[in-house]
Amino acid sequence: MPSKNSINRPKQKVNLNRKVHQRAAKRDAMEKKGLLAPARSSGTSKSGQLKSIPLDLYKGEHSTSGALTTKTLSKKRAKKIERNLKYVEQRKLLVDLQSQSEENGGMQIDAPVVKKEKETKKGQLEKMREAISTVLEDIQSQGLSLQTGSGTTLGGQYFL
């Protein structure tokens, strides 16, 4: 069969029939999976939510239509889901604390946070760098001193 853009291309009806057939097959597959069972407008619909079979298995919400299933949950995946759920709870607590602090009128800190700095022994090179930088800062802070003498820059005095 020639391609869609060739000179002796097939009629438009052939292409449209193929697309309609593909969409119908896709729709039937979604109905078999149970994705179209509750309408999108109903409250029990999961439309727009994430679909995760391992998470459903972890929560016990995944229902099997038959007695035999290939959907299992490994220990590694179960631990990962537990860890992620713990992180979700921590984020919720953090958001709640931030909203409470905004309601109370700004930032209120319960305990002051003190950052500990490690005392490091300074080597000879670091001591020299600090000394040079302090000397340069002192020179820059003094400003530029100009000698105010009488005369021009080229030589003797200039009278009007």
From Swiss-Prot:
Ranges in coiled-coil conformation: none
Location of region: Disordered: 1-51
Keyword line: Cytoplasm, Nucleus, Ribosome biogenesis, Transport
Ranges of Basic residues composition bias in the record: 10-24
Compartment(s) of residence: Cytoplasm; Nucleus
InterPro entries reported in the protein's UniProt record: Ribosome_bgen_Alb1
Compositional bias ranges of the Basic and acidic residues kind: 25-34
Listed Pfam families: Alb1 (PF09135)
GO biological process: ribosome biogenesis
Any GO CC annotation of this UniProt entry: nucleus
Biased composition (Polar residues): 41-50
Cysteines joined through disulfide linkages: none
Function: Involved in proper assembly of pre-ribosomal particles during the biogenesis of the 60S ribosomal subunit. Accompanies the pre-60S particles to the cytoplasm.
Subunit organization: Component of the nucleoplasmic and cytoplasmic pre-60S ribosomal particles.
Family per record: Belongs to the ALB1 family.
Protein name: Ribosome biogenesis protein ALB1
Species of the source: Kluyveromyces lactis (strain ATCC 8585 / CBS 2359 / DSM 70799 / NBRC 1267 / NRRL Y-1140 / WM37)
Gene field: ALB1
